[in-house]
Amino acid sequence: MNISNIKIMLLGSGELGKEFIIAAQRLGIHTIVVDRYKNAPAMQVAHESYVIDMLNSDALEQLILAKNPTYIVPEIEAINTDSLVKLEAHNFNIIPCAKATKLTMDRQGIRALAAQQLNLQTSKFAFANSEQEYLDVIQSIGLPFVIKPVMSSSGKGQSIVKEHNEIKKAWDYAQNGSRGHAKGVIVEQFIDFDYEITLLTVRHKDGTSFCDPIGHIQKDGDYRFSWQPHTMPDTALAKSQEIAKEITDALGGYGVFGVELFIKGDEVFFNEVSPRPHDTGMVTLISQNINEFELHLRAIVGLPIPDIQTLQPSASAAILLEGDTANASICGIDKALADANVDIRIFGKKEIHGKRRMGVVLAKAQNTHIALETSKQALAHIHLTK
């Protein structure tokens, strides 16, 4: 295999894409990245970068035809997936495949696959395309429930509704968080689960591999902390791996899939799946012998994937900062790095208008509890320059 002849085009240039591009650069692979704005994180480390509206089919197809990449790797959902389906039919290699990208871009498609075709256990759910339909389905779902836009990213528009006086506010919040022109929502019965995990699942030429389960804490629908390994009963872990393999086999293609699951005792409920590295999986930058971005790259280009090992208990903490500036300056990194068990990634984003994830703290320790506390202590030092 001569990987120096490979060209990878990344559609989306966020922080996860940046780590993926770094992994590709280390192996001498030519990298091209695309996003809707200049100087996005992955653009800062790629050979070539382009700014286009990836929902515009003409712009997207013209760029791909002009650059003729070996692999096209979607990093975000805001892409014209019909174009990817068409390009795949003309022998372009979409990762993991156009079907997976299209199905997982909206919650209605993936929930139909999981619950109706594969009969995986999920929470009770219903879809609504108007506020009146939303009010109607609440009657059958009952309180408390979770509402999410059918199309959104990074937890935008998600909320848990526990009281009747929160119902209208939750609808409005979902509409504001929805991507594009989609107004639909999914309403799910709230599961009083014991914990939730991400099971990073790698489909590659030699089969399917699993990383150790990653525990995480979400707030406002977005990841704040994660840790690995998350200790769980053997029965629940086996069920989790079975579900993850079933859903990823149905989607097809090669690469890393982030499978989100709720665990209650030995019961496992499917929640969501992303056909790409997962934000909670940033902990693997410090915890594993091969991190999730390297695993994604290896699976895509056909490199060997040996045993995936968790080297030590580890945790990550999202650096979520709040402000209103076009030139963010971050302080406190020196204090955070005074601990030998701490590492940091700053993503290179300059603009903040409200809250924005600007980096991640990584910590290792003799157990995940201490690693999580260490990450929180380091996080407390980091802030915007006043």
Curated annotation (Swiss-Prot):
<feature type="binding site">
    <location>
        <position position="148"/>
    </location>
    <ligand>
        <name>ATP</name>
    </ligand>
</feature>
<dbReference type="InterPro" id="IPR003135">
    <property type="entry name" value="ATP-grasp_carboxylate-amine"/>
</dbReference>
<comment type="subunit">
    <text>Homodimer.</text>
</comment>
<keyword id="KW-0658">Purine biosynthesis</keyword>
<feature type="binding site">
    <location>
        <position position="260"/>
    </location>
    <ligand>
        <name>Mg(2+)</name>
    </ligand>
</feature>
<dbReference type="Pfam" id="PF02222">
    <property type="entry name" value="ATP-grasp"/>
</dbReference>
<dbReference type="InterPro" id="IPR016185">
    <property type="entry name" value="PreATP-grasp_dom_sf"/>
</dbReference>
<dbReference type="InterPro" id="IPR013815">
    <property type="entry name" value="ATP_grasp_subdomain_1"/>
</dbReference>
<dbReference type="Pfam" id="PF21244">
    <property type="entry name" value="PurT_C"/>
</dbReference>
<feature type="binding site">
    <location>
        <position position="107"/>
    </location>
    <ligand>
        <name>ATP</name>
    </ligand>
</feature>
<dbReference type="GO" id="GO:0005829">
    <property type="term" value="C:cytosol"/>
</dbReference>
<dbReference type="GO" id="GO:0005524">
    <property type="term" value="F:ATP binding"/>
</dbReference>
<keyword id="KW-0067">ATP-binding</keyword>
<dbReference type="GO" id="GO:0006189">
    <property type="term" value="P:'de novo' IMP biosynthetic process"/>
</dbReference>
<dbReference type="GO" id="GO:0004644">
    <property type="term" value="F:phosphoribosylglycinamide formyltransferase activity"/>
</dbReference>
<feature type="binding site">
    <location>
        <begin position="153"/>
        <end position="158"/>
    </location>
    <ligand>
        <name>ATP</name>
    </ligand>
</feature>
<dbReference type="GO" id="GO:0043815">
    <property type="term" value="F:phosphoribosylglycinamide formyltransferase 2 activity"/>
</dbReference>
<feature type="domain" description="ATP-grasp">
    <location>
        <begin position="112"/>
        <end position="301"/>
    </location>
</feature>
<keyword id="KW-0479">Metal-binding</keyword>
<feature type="binding site">
    <location>
        <position position="75"/>
    </location>
    <ligand>
        <name>N(1)-(5-phospho-beta-D-ribosyl)glycinamide</name>
    </ligand>
</feature>
<dbReference type="GO" id="GO:0000287">
    <property type="term" value="F:magnesium ion binding"/>
</dbReference>
<dbReference type="InterPro" id="IPR011761">
    <property type="entry name" value="ATP-grasp"/>
</dbReference>
<feature type="binding site">
    <location>
        <position position="279"/>
    </location>
    <ligand>
        <name>N(1)-(5-phospho-beta-D-ribosyl)glycinamide</name>
    </ligand>
</feature>
<dbReference type="InterPro" id="IPR054350">
    <property type="entry name" value="PurT/PurK_preATP-grasp"/>
</dbReference>
<dbReference type="InterPro" id="IPR011054">
    <property type="entry name" value="Rudment_hybrid_motif"/>
</dbReference>
<dbReference type="InterPro" id="IPR048740">
    <property type="entry name" value="PurT_C"/>
</dbReference>
<feature type="binding site">
    <location>
        <begin position="15"/>
        <end position="16"/>
    </location>
    <ligand>
        <name>N(1)-(5-phospho-beta-D-ribosyl)glycinamide</name>
    </ligand>
</feature>
<keyword id="KW-0460">Magnesium</keyword>
<protein>
    <recommendedName>
        <fullName>Formate-dependent phosphoribosylglycinamide formyltransferase</fullName>
        <ecNumber>6.3.1.21</ecNumber>
    </recommendedName>
</protein>
<comment type="function">
    <text>Involved in the de novo purine biosynthesis. Catalyzes the transfer of formate to 5-phospho-ribosyl-glycinamide (GAR), producing 5-phospho-ribosyl-N-formylglycinamide (FGAR). Formate is provided by PurU via hydrolysis of 10-formyl-tetrahydrofolate.</text>
</comment>
<feature type="binding site">
    <location>
        <begin position="356"/>
        <end position="357"/>
    </location>
    <ligand>
        <name>N(1)-(5-phospho-beta-D-ribosyl)glycinamide</name>
    </ligand>
</feature>
<keyword id="KW-0436">Ligase</keyword>
<comment type="pathway">
    <text>Purine metabolism; IMP biosynthesis via de novo pathway; N(2)-formyl-N(1)-(5-phospho-D-ribosyl)glycinamide from N(1)-(5-phospho-D-ribosyl)glycinamide (formate route): step 1/1.</text>
</comment>
<feature type="binding site">
    <location>
        <position position="349"/>
    </location>
    <ligand>
        <name>N(1)-(5-phospho-beta-D-ribosyl)glycinamide</name>
    </ligand>
</feature>
<feature type="binding site">
    <location>
        <begin position="188"/>
        <end position="191"/>
    </location>
    <ligand>
        <name>ATP</name>
    </ligand>
</feature>
<dbReference type="InterPro" id="IPR005862">
    <property type="entry name" value="PurT"/>
</dbReference>
<dbReference type="Pfam" id="PF22660">
    <property type="entry name" value="RS_preATP-grasp-like"/>
</dbReference>
<feature type="binding site">
    <location>
        <position position="196"/>
    </location>
    <ligand>
        <name>ATP</name>
    </ligand>
</feature>
<keyword id="KW-0547">Nucleotide-binding</keyword>
<comment type="similarity">
    <text>Belongs to the PurK/PurT family.</text>
</comment>
<feature type="binding site">
    <location>
        <position position="272"/>
    </location>
    <ligand>
        <name>Mg(2+)</name>
    </ligand>
</feature>
